[in-house]
């Protein structure tokens, strides 16, 4: 809080008055991140896409945007959660919100998926393939471009979830 107050040129009491606590700061950072990534709007666009492949292309793009614009936010969350129980609670809440949002998308898209997949299975596959850690592994440590990741994710989601023609 002290660093934020110093950087903003305000008293620490002002920071507390606005954000209340560390969770409030993390929520504000996350809100800006969601806005910058545009991923929620892309998911809404995907939900009205009548073509299953097009739907998954859009969510691959949304996922790429989410992690591409969120690397610093993820580092902030991880670092804060490692040392502060309040921040750990906020991280847990954020991840639960992500699961809920993705599960909603899967439920709304389930008519496109392979018949042998339950909604729970499709959700688990989808959530696993769209983890930040997977994006980070491929783009940061394995030399993939964000375009490579997006193309791979779209193809892999289609292979894993869609009925084959």
Task: Indicate where each model-derived feature is located.
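Helix-turn-helix
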Residues: 1-24, 28
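Amphipathic alpha-helical packing segments from all-alpha helical-bundle domains
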Residues: 61-78, 85-112, 120-124, 156-162
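Hydrophobic/aromatic-rich alpha-helical bundle segments in the mid-to-C-terminal region
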Residues: 109-156, 164-165
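Short, basic, alpha-helical segments at the C-terminal edge of helix-turn-helix-like DNA-binding modules
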Residues: 1, 30-37
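Hydrophobic alpha-helical connector segments
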Residues: 22-24, 28, 41-68
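Alpha-helical transmembrane segments of polytopic integral membrane proteins
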Residues: 39, 70, 132-135
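Helix-loop segments that flank and shape redox-cofactor active sites
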Residues: 2-6, 48, 80-84
